[in-house]
Amino acid sequence: MNSNYLLLPHFDPSIFTLGDSNIGLRWYGLMYLLGFVFARWLAVRRANRPNSGWTVDQVDSLLFNGFMGVFIGGRVGDVFFYNLDHFLQEPLYLFRVWEGGMSFHGGLIGVIVAMIWTSYSQKRNFWQTADFVAPLIPFGLGLGRIGNFINLELWGRETNVPWAMIFPNDPLLLPRHPSQLYEAFLEGLVLFTILNIFIKKPRPMASVAGLFLIGYGVFRFIVEYVREPEVENFFGIITRGQALCLPMIIGGAFIMAWAYSRKSAVIK
């Protein structure tokens, strides 16, 4: 082991547990909770602006549905995108949430379903809902990646860059990219800043949602080059995460082009 690199301490992923059980509060869960608290604060702040088109009750309903979509979709996505073999051998693994992670792409699908339902129940245009939700997401994503870092999971590939870190649960104890922190910065702080500047300017409906898809897809695709793959690459060229990001980038670009072609639907 090279002593020139930072050796991280072995963080306990649990803040506390109840007795000898696996029930308790984990840092990863706390980060998700803080992300939703911040999202509600920001959403209520925007809803209280004149002519926002939203009430606080509608925001709370939207966020509750979104929370369920993230939790259910994220868990199901993690199982089916990354741990399908484990699930086929042991179907109850799907319900042991304390043993697995959360997939962003699965969570995104869950949020889309939640937005469709919320839009229908509130008799609202889906793209109005999607544009309202998109700027709320990145901050929570950034906190989630910090949770991954504390959990000492989803680390990067081996490297010799000066800021490389050695993760104590890595059997090889190799210096690696802290890819979780790269994602926290790009998918969290940078994407949050871009979207919240963009919504302050005149724009067509659906463009905010399209920009989110492009931004997340591009940032995640880039970081995947230095992130240790969880599963085999596709055709030895791209990772599973990159393959899942390509439809986001293409879909986001299509939505942006479609939105700007509808010149009569500019939001000021």
From Swiss-Prot:
Main location: membrane
Binding sites annotated in the UniProt record for a 1,2-diacyl-sn-glycero-3-phospho-(1'-sn-glycerol): 145
Species per Swiss-Prot/TrEMBL record: Haemophilus influenzae (strain ATCC 51907 / DSM 11121 / KW20 / Rd)
Keyword Transferase: yes
Protein name: Phosphatidylglycerol--prolipoprotein diacylglyceryl transferase
EC number: 2.5.1.145
The UniProt record lists the keyword Transferase: yes
Phylogenetic lineage: Bacteria, Pseudomonadati, Pseudomonadota, Gammaproteobacteria, Pasteurellales
PROSITE patterns according to UniProt: LGT
Function: Catalyzes the transfer of the diacylglyceryl group from phosphatidylglycerol to the sulfhydryl group of the N-terminal cysteine of a prolipoprotein, the first step in the formation of mature lipoproteins.
Transmembrane segments: 23-43, 62-82, 97-117, 132-152, 179-199, 206-226, 241-261
Alphabetic keyword roster: Cell inner membrane, Cell membrane, Membrane, Transferase, Transmembrane, Transmembrane helix
Pfam families: LGT
Family affiliation: Belongs to the Lgt family.
